[in-house]
Amino acid sequence: MSTYQATASAPVNIACIKYWGKRDTKLILPTNSSLSVTLDQDYLKSTTTSRADPSFEKDQLWLNGTEDEIKPGSRLETCIKEMKRLRKVEVEDKDPSAPKLSTYHVRIASYNNFPTAAGLASSASGFAALVSSLAALYKLPVSPSTLSLIARQGSGSACRSLYGGFVAWEQGTKADGSDSLAIQIAPESHWPTLHAVVCVVNDAKKGTSSTAGMQRTVETSPLLQHRIKHVVPQRMAEISDAIRARDFDAFARITMQDSNQFHAVALDTDPPIFYMNDVSKAIVALIVEYNRVAIEKTGKRKAAYTYDAGPNAVIYVEQENVKEIVDLILQYFPDAAANFKDVFNLYANDQKKGAVVSGFNEAVAQKWEGGVKGIIHTKIGDGPRTLGENEALLDASGLPKKLA
């Protein structure tokens, strides 16, 4: 008997223009458009294997080796149902000889190679990998934008992980959500020297989940309404132009402004929401001072911080300046050196140690033992990948190879 199985991986994306707030909570339709950078899967990714079999008695999912119940009406169930519907409409209805996989239950195993729910977008890469593996299993002849419509219903930001490079999630205007989808602004090959330095400030679960937090903001923040109407549309256009022109200075300015406003909107929520902590704020001070020196010398910024709904910093920087940024973080957070894999060989045979650029005012922040737990250096990357059987997460019987 045939085995119907496929494995795919999907990347993390980090927004430069933030998504925060839904106009429809069931379909996950956003109050504003957003734009993100896809990070390289060689460093951060979710991998998912999906199998369909007539002998399976129910749909089942394991996340990082632990079974996760697929609750009726949940986002997970919605995504699986929608993918089965696409299989029927796009394949089985058109080709009567195609196996009726849409009628089989599925078993799905998913694994993240980074901490889940820690301010790194695990739900985005997770739902993108889920949809991509089911699309491969079902042999769907559809575009990433079409798949993004389904991934969006799992986790809004997941729709942006269906492409590599620079990706916009267009908010759309239709009530059914059919125009709220992801489009690629530029592929990863357009700006290959753009790198990202992730400072892992805290890998514990956060206090206020994004889902709960953003709806409280929609209900109570007047600043969010100003942001939606007057700020985001202009920023979306400006940052898209900056990306097309590879204008790092403009890209950095807009990215930092939008991160600041997102956290201002969280603070404007009643009661207020705090995602950044004192370590996060210290990193902002370091990047502001680093850019002050850069502007004095060259007239342009050289780094951009951004924070999602958590304390971790993501710092965008051109490849030639990455070492200065890592040096800076290690100068103020020396413990981070223990959890920094130097995958790009910045230090070659040198010892990893902190330093600041000349002209830097070291009084802008205090040294902080244990403040940054680790540093991840990565770069811009591609969209979902279909993987071979040797990377499958399910064994011959259709159960996870690794259980927690």
Predicted regions and their residues:
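ATP-binding N-lobe of GHMP and related small-molecule kinases
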Residues: 1-118, 132-144, 371-404
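C-terminal nucleotide
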Residues: 2-15, 21-25, 29, 57, ...
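Short beta-strand scaffold segments in enzyme catalytic cores
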Residues: 15-18, 46-50, 158-161, 165-170, ...
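Short capping/connector residues at structural and topological boundaries
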Residues: 24-25, 40-44, 119, 125, ...
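Short amphipathic alpha-helical segments
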Residues: 68-75, 126, 143, 275, ...
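Charged/polar, low-hydrophobicity segments characteristic of intrinsically disordered regions
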Residues: 78, 82, 159-171, 230-234, ...
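Gly/Ser-rich oxyanion-binding loop with an adjacent helix/lid
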Residues: 90-193, 203
